[in-house]
Amino acid sequence: MRLIAIAAVMAALCLAGCGSGTSDPGDGGVLRATFSSFPDYLDPALSHSEEGWTAIYDTYVPLLTYRHADGKAGSEVIPGLARALPEISGDGLTYRFRLRDGLRYSNGKPVVASDFKRAVERVFVLNSSGSPFFTDIVGAAEFAKTKKGGIRGIVAGDRSGEITIKLTHPRGTFLQELALPFTAPLPAGTPDEDLSGNPPPATGPYEIVSSKPGRGWSYARNPYWAKANAKAMPQLPGGSVDRIEVTVVRNASSQVDDVEAGRYDWMENPPPPDRYAEVKDSYEGTQFRTEATESTYFFWMNTTQPPFDDLRVRRAVNYAVDPEALERIYAGQVVSTQQILPPGMPGYERFQLYPHNLGKAKKLVEDADPADRQITVWTDDERSQEEAGSYLAEVLKDVGFEAKLQVVNSDNYFSLVGNQSTSNLDIGWASWFQDYPHPNDFFQPMFSEESIFPTNTSNLARFADPKVSAKIAELAEQPLTPAVEAEYADLDREVMEQAPWVPYGTGTLGTFVSPAIDLDQVIYNPTFNQDLTSFRFK
């Protein structure tokens, strides 16, 4: 959701696309930003992280999208490349769209209906962690296995601009999922490979014109935004700044210093715990703002191999971990909880199956008497996560294991722990931020059997329970009524009784900008975080 500047963008590119329809004094200029790590991907089919979605929200527009707004308003699904929300058949199985006229990619090619069909197929070809959202399309499950013949449940007419999607059964969350970046159309001929180093042409107000994985990337105005797409999609903002240059700066304290001094205009990640209070006290309301999130921080356990294939061991770790100790590590930026669903999510119901009890944890490990006591603890190299991983390693030692900490560059962390071929995937840190405001998003990607892949898996615990998977699928078909919310609360408890995770908190993030930026104008979208189109200079 990084070497002072990345390669300069040619002025001609900027001038060709300038203009969001305004001439306010704050328009124009170059926004200089820092991220603590390079996103998982800068490819819309693959990106599935808060950093990645912040980076691509204003470049790749799906058929539907989320309103560019703060809070609850930002969770509203609105038309993107489609003229309107779809016509949905009475049985909930058929969705009909029509593309807007005159749409162009940033390379000048016209956007056509078949580009959407290919985008969905590309998600499956690349084994994207987003593919479970679309397996209910007729023919998608078969295509996921064979990667041949196309998905027959999508019919696209390039002349008419009409797109028809047929589902195998109703899916109550399908509109929200279509508004995610995964299936944003891309031009015909886009390679079926990770394009993070050379991101594909854009349909949004900005295009990524340079990318150096691990170091940074830069944007210019899409030259076809003002010419075509802004007229076709007047509901979407065009952005104020002309260019954006992002640099990866791994030392969060240095980022704070740089933003204070005006060397950078914005740091995407929050201030580090040891600087958080200082920044909050000094700049809240003028340069700093705390942002609530729907998120869960947790430790996953690999349920497919010893010792965590034993329920007693998994429960022992839950008893041994003290969420309040982790809250202190994060200096209050994570508030302790022990549920899968975060407090603001429909279906949340507070419970505490595993109150901190080290003695009980030791007894469970003693009863299980696992033969394998050599544990690898995985985490990334961002400071709070590394400290959380160190804490977990010490807890495991306290209950009778030999634990080794494996710290991974945050750029590659989820690619490594999501890859089945990675050795010693025992237990590790992770966090999950909502994809869309529905409790299904906290269950299907992480606890359904269909979300286990050889690569890019989001089910990090490799948790496979047919009964739970069936319940997740059943609830996904239904409208989100109070009765269904109560069923999600029951599902939360049911999964945690099997203890594939150790949930320990829900997080807040922060927006920290230089004195040159108008903080009041910065939009914090609940799915995509800071909206690049909303940054403007005073």
List the model feature ranges, each with a label.
Residues 68-72, 148, 170-243, 359:
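Gly/Pro-rich hinge or "lid" segments in bacterial periplasmic/extracellular proteins
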Residues 34-90, 201:
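N-terminal lobe/hinge region of extracytoplasmic solute-binding protein
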Residues 220, 227, 308-399, 462, ...:
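Append "and occasionally in soluble cytosolic enzymes with long acidic Gly/Pro-rich linkers
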Residues 96-98, 115-117, 125, 129-187, ...:
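Surface-exposed binding/hinge segments that line
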Residues 33, 108, 397-451, 486-487:
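Periplasmic binding protein-like
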Residues 192-197, 225-278, 402:
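Ligand-site clamp/hinge motif
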Residues 19, 86, 154-156, 315, ...:
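Extracytoplasmic/peripheral linker and loop segments enriched in polar/acidic and small residues
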Residues 511-538:
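Long beta-strand-rich cores associated with HINT superfamily self-processing modules
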